[in-house]
Amino acid sequence: MVSGPFLFDTSAESWFARTDNPQALDWLRGYLSRHQVQVSAVTVLERVRGYSLLWRRAQPDARGRIEAARIAYLNGLGRVWPIDSAAAVVAGEIMALLPNPPTPPRRSHRLAESQSERLARWRFDGLIAATALVTAMPLVHNNAADFETIRSGIECAPQRFPRLGPLELIRCTSLA
């Protein structure tokens, strides 16, 4: 099932970068033979922020490796979708409809997050979902809690999202 193009969420990019699942990597190679990876500008923001946080917390001897990974990521970017007025309107509707994240801040994660960081990540997911809706691309993700909540909210208030199809979600683990 290599089709597309798809919009890749930050969680999917991270998952594909870490996985050793041969079927998933075969799927990704097949996808990349036909399409560029397409992401929202928000995904770039989240990834650069992640590299910068790692760099700040790293020992000096590890910082060069982190910076090299950041530069490689930026040099390898495919299509980056901006947050234009259409995506901003849809994201505003999502944020008004669903102001609070469905899950609490991460505590078991290597870098525990505060309530305000969790709210920011939730809003970033709303912007990424809005980009997927406006571009009419399925969203590949590894964050079912947030994106399923967003999709359900949109389905409960379709009048707030005229002329947009449903939010089509593909969990990256299902591609393997």
Predicted features by range, described:
Residues 1, 129-176:
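Acidic, PIN/NYN-like endoribonuclease modules and their adjacent C-terminal/linker elements
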Residues 12-13, 43, 87, 128, ...:
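Alpha-helix capping/helix-boundary segments
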Residues 76-118:
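Acidic catalytic patch
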